[in-house]
């Protein structure tokens, strides 16, 4: 039977390719050389979705996330203060670079903390592995010795995809000088036991004992497959750059076999672009969109939905423009289908329900969450001037167990209006009454008739009733309906257009409507 979701497909593939196991290990990781952006998050959530699918099939899963923080600091991001100071740390391990924003921790750790803080909000709780501690505590000493003893095999594996071959005096390690802390070093000799001799551009020369030194690490193309074997990784995806022909994944598949391991099940995930915000995703430039930024506009459920509803090998955009409304509408439809409020063809229902399940940070609630369209909510937020208590009081039949998610959605709407909504979407109810042109007598009469109709019928009139009455009154007073609408908007919000007028009036309420329009009739 066809699986309901791509994550379920890969869960089945892992079990088939790796055989029955008491524990399956899935992995992700990144170098925290800058803000961990939403493109990096795609890998993390892809692994989380597969981990959930494995768990749902009855398997035990270990989800590890490696901070590759013993990598070299190669470039100063443009958004970091004290650029000159940071330049002095180039070529050192990024764990040694200070965080010039907080001055409380290292640059790498600050980036890690920022990312770790938001993952549980979207239901992701991996086991974090600090690779700098692994190396400096000697955890990989035997793996380093193994690599040095298999130098020729590793060289051949790397050369298979290189245009310029490695030199004969190449060694499968890099060394941070113990004097200047930089990796500007050359390995001069290995005694085939535990001693490595090196020299540094700073003039330092010495021998290191593999078993006790903090300064030796494996280069990334060897380190990655070494850890596949060390952690017994069963699944790890990678971006299209790593999966290109002859790329790092092809090399690593061969190198892990030298370490007497096997490559994990994998897939290629594509890039993410940003729509309605501008700027290219780049950690080194500092112009990035982080998970925190996305959660300002999208609730945790909808954030997960963006990824769960898209195949990983498909490029897609995360929108901050008017498409936000459509994305929320799509999510709400999946929610209605999941809870049986809306029906679709049976062959689609299973897939829709599975996407909804995987979109939840934790377990789906027993009853359907309170539903309100994002466009409608955005109007309500502006009418009540972003006062959450007033918004909740206006909305009807909100149950206590629905409030938290609803409040989160309200906050996202408020943030979106403030930061990203187009100007013609924004409004505020008129509070000053000195900037409107004098209305003609027939317009004053028409607005007065509308006010009287509303005062008599407001509680029972539907939006359609109000809409019909506006058209009727405009025609009876020889006013073009388009002009009459424009005049009412101008009175209410000092703009020539706005939200759908009948619904807008219903939300404002008769008292506020009368208070404003009575100044002009």
From Swiss-Prot:
A motif ('KMSKS' region) lies at residues 280-284. Its main location: cytoplasm. Keywords: Aminoacyl-tRNA synthetase, ATP-binding, Cytoplasm, Ligase, Nucleotide-binding, Protein biosynthesis. GO terms for cellular component: cytoplasm. GO terms for molecular function: ATP binding; lysine-tRNA ligase activity; tRNA binding. Its EC number is 6.1.1.6. It holds the Pfam family tRNA-synt_1f. It catalyses: tRNA(Lys) + L-lysine + ATP = L-lysyl-tRNA(Lys) + AMP + diphosphate. One of its GO terms (biological process) is lysyl-tRNA aminoacylation. It is an enzyme of class 6 (ligase). A motif ('HIGH' region) lies at residues 32-40. It is found in: Cytoplasm. It comes from the Bacteria. InterPro entries: aa-tRNA-synth_I_codon-bd_sub2, aa-tRNA-synth_I_CS, aa_tRNA-synth_I_cd-bd_sf, Lys-tRNA-ligase, Lys-tRNA-ligase_SC_fold, Rossmann-like_a/b/a_fold. PANTHER family: LYSINE--TRNA LIGASE (PTHR37940:SF1). Belongs to the class-I aminoacyl-tRNA synthetase family. This is Lysine--tRNA ligase. The lineage of its organism: Bacteria, Pseudomonadati, Spirochaetota, Spirochaetia, Spirochaetales.
